[in-house]
């Protein structure tokens, strides 16, 4: 009985591994039609009895403001061009901070956020964290950094039911994603820790301060030219 269970379990794992690799390879070239988070939001709205129309329009890399690309990296993951999906120094800092109590600090990279938004459900279980690590490793192996950021910008939530840079730009500022100004981009990046509570178009004092800090970081990183580092070769994971 145990042997039969182990055989079936092993077969299921192999099917899952193969299927997930295939899915990641497909999305390397094909725009994902939606995300797991979008499905979750739709289900939540049905359960609450308040249906919402999800807003999302996929835009390729060249049709998204470079300022937004740099702003998101500056605000969310400044080591994005260097790491292989996991920022070990940020993880250590978050663990040390959380041990002191108070608010919980996260350490998710852009790659990890793509993994959980695209493929997984919300939550903090060990199973979900394990699957997040698996999908993060896959996209880091099979996707270039530019593709990871492109998918991120087209899938992240920027208000309740508003997904992706194009929908966010039109929802908050009435312009397309390619026309976002540096200031507008910084406000969109500033609300990403909690986009359903904070608003890029009606910012609180804290969001305005954070947007100002992001603009400073964008300048320190080198502005648009920083995007060229996405093509640089990275050190091997074990050398970091």
UniProtKB/Swiss-Prot annotation:
An example molecular function term from Gene Ontology annotations: pentosyltransferase activity
Catalytic activity field: [GlcNAc-(1->4)-Mur2Ac(oyl-L-Ala-gamma-D-Glu-L-Lys-D-Ala-D-Ala)](n)-di-trans,octa-cis-undecaprenyl diphosphate + beta-D-GlcNAc-(1->4)-Mur2Ac(oyl-L-Ala-gamma-D-Glu-L-Lys-D-Ala-D-Ala)-di-trans,octa-cis-undecaprenyl diphosphate = [GlcNAc-(1->4)-Mur2Ac(oyl-L-Ala-gamma-D-Glu-L-Lys-D-Ala-D-Ala)](n+1)-di-trans,octa-cis-undecaprenyl diphosphate + di-trans,octa-cis-undecaprenyl diphosphate + H(+)
Entry keywords, A to Z: Cell inner membrane, Cell membrane, Cell shape, Cell wall biogenesis/degradation, Glycosyltransferase, Membrane, Peptidoglycan synthesis, Transferase, Transmembrane, Transmembrane helix
Keyword Transferase on entry: yes
Annotated GO biological process: cell wall organization; peptidoglycan biosynthetic process; regulation of cell shape
Record-linked InterPro entries: Glyco_trans_51 (IPR001264), Lysozyme-like_dom_sf (IPR023346), PBP_transglycosylase (IPR036950), Pep_trsgly (IPR011812)
Metabolic or biological pathway, per its Swiss-Prot or TrEMBL entry: Cell wall biogenesis; peptidoglycan biosynthesis
EC number(s) recorded for this UniProt protein: 2.4.99.28
Compartments, record wording: Cell inner membrane
Regions crossing the membrane: 12-31
Keyword Cell inner membrane carried by entry: yes
GO cellular component: peptidoglycan-based cell wall; plasma membrane
Membrane topology qualifier: Single-pass membrane protein
Enzyme class: transferase
Lineage: superkingdom: Bacteria
UniProt family annotation: Belongs to the glycosyltransferase 51 family.
Function: Peptidoglycan polymerase that catalyzes glycan chain elongation from lipid-linked precursors.
Official protein name in the record: Biosynthetic peptidoglycan transglycosylase
UniProt source species: Pseudomonas fluorescens (strain Pf0-1)
